[in-house]
């Protein structure tokens, strides 16, 4: 049913998203869900893309929104592409334009088209500095002092960049309340600001396999500074004598693939399988009882929410601010003090050996995952859209 919320000047409100490679990654996957939800609620939705990767859509996905091309290439905000975006916004009568990248020509585009622009940050605020913070903690004392000086310079540079985005954005979306609080504090924003919480959505499976196998799962990219899968291998070395009938499956890929396999050989790890990357994650969630993460930092990890939706109990380090939004009680996962590998190993063994506890937590994490439904996420987007449209009507 058409309402004032999805009408503008007697036509459907048109919301467009910008993407370089689509769909490719967590932000684009959420865009698919949000785009379909907005279409089903009476909005016109278009995704403008440079490279349309149709083979990357989830199996069985029915797309309701339009996808229209931009000039192909690798830089979304070159002068040539910026002009193409301007022309597309005017031609398609776009009311709200959503971007996940800090756009060089955003202010120019707004001036030329009058479009409302929404920036959505799909990482923690100032995530660009997290890897440097980790490197400082691991560095030799002399090198650490040099890195600390460099970090102060980088801090100031990125604060200016974030302030610039906040200045041109009509709305600034973040993934959870703790990210909003952090951004508000670090940028010294007023309490009534443009930052809004637009949480990730996770498709809820229609069938959840509760008959799990004795499998512990890692699923994600191989990226040393952030993911630290080497920690998981050392933890597995500790626990494998105590869990002889359990298996560790590592699903994913990246530049560390060869070195991690070599490390597993050096540690003489047993009952471990490197499965490689895959788009068919459901088959792994269906079998696994426990999900392991050993990251130094994360944003709002979709893999954690997907595991919960499929009844896989997570265990991970309490190493990033959004973790308590996903694991908000002891029944929704196991949090370990960073980065105590002995404590992690002890907790993992205890969880693996306690069938009754895992079964109880399995049901609880499935319930928790319902809070990530597209209806909840869509409602947050609808509230943001209403606010932006009402500013024009007011």
Where are these regions (language model features)?
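A conserved mid-protein helix/loop that constitutes part of the nucleotide-sugar donor-binding site
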Residues: 28-33, 214, 223-238, 255-261, ...
């Amino acid at each position: 049913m058409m309402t004032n919320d999805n009408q503008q000047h007697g036509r459907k409100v048109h919301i467009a998203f910008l993407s370089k490679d689509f769909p490719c990654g967590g932000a684009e996957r959420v865009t698919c869900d949000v785009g379909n939800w907005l279409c089903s609620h009476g909005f016109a939705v278009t995704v403008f893309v440079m490279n349309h990767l149709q083979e990357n859509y989830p199996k069985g996905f029915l797309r309701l929104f339009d996808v229209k091309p931009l000039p192909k290439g690798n830089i979304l905000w070159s002068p040539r592409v910026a002009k193409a975006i301007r022309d597309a916004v005017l031609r398609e009568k776009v009311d709200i334009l959503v971007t996940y990248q800090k756009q060089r020509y955003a202010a120019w585009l707004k001036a030329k088209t009058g479009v409302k622009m929404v920036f959505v940050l799909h990482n923690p605020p100032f995530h660009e500095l997290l890897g440097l913070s980790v490197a400082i903690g691991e560095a030799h004392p002399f090198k650490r002092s040099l890195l600390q000086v460099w970090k102060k310079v980088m801090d100031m540079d990125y604060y200016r960049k974030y302030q610039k985005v906040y200045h041109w954005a009509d709305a600034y979306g973040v993934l959870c309340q703790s990210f909003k609080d952090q951004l508000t504090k670090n940028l010294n924003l007023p309490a009534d600001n443009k930052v809004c919480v637009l949480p990730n959505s996770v498709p809820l499976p229609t069938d959840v396999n509760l008959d799990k196998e004795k499998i512990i799962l890692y699923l994600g990219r191989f990226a040393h500074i952030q993911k630290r899968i080497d920690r998981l291998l050392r933890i597995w070395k500790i626990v494998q004598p105590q869990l002889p009938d359990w298996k560790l499956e590592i699903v994913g890929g990246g530049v560390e693939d060869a070195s991690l396999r070599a490390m597993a050989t050096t540690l003489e790890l047993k009952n471990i399988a490197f499965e490689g990357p895959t788009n068919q994650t459901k088959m792994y969630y269906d079998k696994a009882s426990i999900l392991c993460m050993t990251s130094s930092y994360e944003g709002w990890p979709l893999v954690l929410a997907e595991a919960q939706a499929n009844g896989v109990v997570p265990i991970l380090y309490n190493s990033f601010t959004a973790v308590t939004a996903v694991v908000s009680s002891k029944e929704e996962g196991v949090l370990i003090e960073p980065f105590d590998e002995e404590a992690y190993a002890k907790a993992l063994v205890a969880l693996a050996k306690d069938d009754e506890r895992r079964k109880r937590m399995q049901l609880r994490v499935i319930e928790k995952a319902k809070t990530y439904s597209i209806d909840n996420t869509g409602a947050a987007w609808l509230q943001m859209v209403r606010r932006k449209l009402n500013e024009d009507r007011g």
